[in-house]
Regions:
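Hydrophobic positions on the alpha1 helix immediately C-terminal to the Walker A/P-loop
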Residues: 113, 117
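P-loop NTPase motor-domain active sites and their immediate coupling elements
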Residues: 1, 11, 21, 42-91, ...
Length: 233
């Protein structure tokens, strides 16, 4: 899509644009238009028009932008999602979500999107900073990651193994909450920063604590997994 930003003349209500959306689409020979009136934080109205020809979003191009480099400095787990309607790179922080569902019809690019986001994590985070738990019941989507040193476990391909892996993740989560409470911190970033500041000065009862990497759990075909073992996952 392409977004046009329009600043109404003084005295013109933004409601006018919604009322005349069909006329705008006809004048632009577009199938339809979406009117965002107003664009939050601005004095403009956004008119979003579907492009006749789709633009290919290049991963390398976005990964090379200053936008991604800056996001990587500020975000704990930067994900390259794509571009927004104005053509600017769209980067999201998985650590702030912290859950993400990628949905769509067959052949619409769900796996491409997922691989792009995984690649952006691997590009920026070392195995000491990030671990991955990959669940691939179809056995065909995540084989390329088999040799990655970021894996906390080989790619999980069996349903029973998936249940065990998720149970391990729940146990690990509880253990991490206990460790964070011992340092009076609320999240992984705060825990690691606090631990680093105490290096060489840790009291004896905290000497067993070690830095914690993030753990990202990625499940391909979640619906199929839930159909097979809904009660367990």
């Amino acid at each position: 899509v392409t977004t046009y930003m329009v600043r109404p003349a003084r005295g013109v209500s933004v409601r006018v644009f919604n009322r005349h959306a069909d006329d705008i689409a006809r004048s632009l020979m577009a199938v339809s238009v979406f009117v965002q009136a107003p664009v939050p934080g601005t004095d403009t109205v956004g008119i979003v028009i579907p492009n006749h020809n789709r633009e290919i979003v290049n991963f390398r191009e976005i990964a090379s932008t200053e936008t991604f480099r800056e996001a990587s400095r500020k975000m704990a787990l930067p994900l390259i999602v794509g571009k927004d309607t104005t053509g600017r790179p769209y980067i999201a922080d998985l650590a702030k979500m912290p859950h993400l569902l990628v949905a769509g019809a067959t052949g619409q690019g769900k796996s491409v999107c997922l691989n792009a986001m995984l690649t952006s994590l691997l590009l920026e985070k070392t195995p000491d900073e990030l671990k991955l738990l990959l669940v691939d019941p179809k056995r065909v989507e995540m084989g390329m990651y088999e040799d990655e040193s970021h894996l906390v476990h080989p790619v999980v391909k069996e349903v029973q193994d998936a249940k065990n892996a998720l149970n391990w993740a729940v146990h690990e989560m509880d253990e991490r909450y206990t460790r964070m409470s011992r340092l009076n911190t609320k999240n992984i970033t705060g825990y690691n920063q606090r631990l680093a500041s105490l290096q060489g000065k840790l009291p004896p009862d905290l000497e067993d604590l070690e830095p914690m990497p993030y753990i990202a759990i990625v499940i391909d075909e979640l619906a199929a997994l839930m159909l097979q073992c809904r009660k367990d996952v």
